[in-house]
Amino acid sequence: MNKFDEFIESNEKDLDVDTSTRNSIISMSPVRKTGRKIRSASSNGYRLEHHRTSSAGSMHSQRLMTPTRLNDQDHPLQAKPDARRVVTRHSSVSVPNAMSKRRSLIQPMVVPTTPESQNNLPSVSHSEGSYGIPLESTTVLSSEQAMASGLRRSRNGSSQSVNSMIATTIPTNGVDVSALLQSLATKELELLECKQKIEDLKKQTQHEEQNYTRRARELHELKEQVSKHLDPSLNTPVKNRAFSPVYQNIPLESRTENAGNSSLPSSVSKPKNMGHQSTNQSRSVSPQDIQERRQRDDSSDSSKQSLWSKPLALFNQFDKIIQHEIERTLNWDDSLSGTPEVQEGTPTSNSESSAQQYDNEAPGARQKSPSQGSVSRSLWSFVSDVKAGLLGIEEENDNDVITDNRCDPVYKSDRQHEQKKSTHKITNRGQAEDSGDDSSLNMRKFKTTTKFQKDNAGNNSLTDESGHRTREKKSKRSSNKLSFIGEPDNDNSSVQKLS
């Protein structure tokens, strides 16, 4: 016995506590203070421990995990006033073995199974397997199997310990409730984990959708930037683009509804703007698309013609006036200078009368500079015709019928006969516009109230003498003459100013 064991025994004596292991003492009974310390092995109160010898020859004690008697009074650590500490120790037990014996007091107490219960374990596992409970999920059964395998090698010959262990075995005639509850809790935890995973996946899906939307928007913005760099025409404002994709899909009839009611300046400026914008648009359109667009424009119906009827009529009027003045100055001035003419209400007759007046009043100026005189007369007649035409647009429809019977055919020359034919064509211009036919559009015939009154006076003067008719004619020519601010009254000064 070493000093460590002596120290422990002395402390146990002072404290009156027994700290020996249960493998050396099975049960204790009150012992009176007598001279004996150790009773014989044949006594009823104690059962000696069983030892087995290993292959190395060292002695190992087989420890029992549970007491044979389940009574609080027989507990070895319970202090009793009349109890005496009894320690049975084998002389061959080493110090580390004694330390392990003392540490075994804090180990958990597990109830072992009997050999009879071991025979019923396969049936229990089969019944548990039928309910879908694996044996690995139960810690109680695994610990029981481990202890049972260790107890098979032990030599328990005491009938008292066997009876006590049979009484404390777990009933195996049914399913273990604790195992069912444990499996139920496990399944609930698994369901909660699955639900949490589903929620996490949903959140991740929403986050990915937001990222996808943001990246798609960024891609669209990059495409717009690249298109602006490649095509400078896209940088122009939207109001300057005529052939936008949305505008191309609109039918031509709906586009021309409001265009027909627009004012004259907007109608005149619209073709210029559209031509300018179409050149910008053609930069980003292939030649095939341009050809197809031209074919569609050529094959459009009469609604397109009615759209441009009024601007074309105005252009036609200016063209006829300019053409007439050019022809008159180049070819007809010399041939018609000496022929008497009758004043008519058309712009061409006004130009003729003014030209004849200039020829009669200033022959010296025209002989000195014939080219300058012809140009001045042309400009003068053109300005007079435009002024008379703008003032007589509203009275056009009321005075067209009276114009045809205004003059006598006796005083008409060949040139006047041709002008009468052109006037008859212009009279039917309203019907040509309604039918959509532009072939009959000709120079418009303008007429004012003063002209109408003077024409009536001229028709009445045809029956008078030639001198009286000449005087009326001269007064008409002077009335149709365009006067400027600060201009003298005499005709000679006006002719000199124009020349």
Swiss-Prot record:
Instruction: Give the start-end ranges of region Disordered.
Output: 32-62, 252-306, 332-377, 400-499
Q: Which residues carry this modification: Phosphothreonine?
A: 236
Q: Where is the composition biased (Basic residues)?
A: 470-479
Q: Where is the composition biased (Polar residues)?
A: 257-287, 332-359, 368-377
Q: Which residues form a coiled coil?
A: 179-231
**Does the entry feature the keyword Phosphoprotein, yes or no?**
yes
Q: Which UniProt keywords apply?
A: Coiled coil, Cytoplasm, Phosphoprotein
- Say which family it is in: Belongs to the TDA11 family.
This protein is called Topoisomerase I damage affected protein 11
Organism placement in taxonomy: Eukaryota, Fungi, Dikarya, Ascomycota, Saccharomycotina
Q: Source gene?
A: TDA11
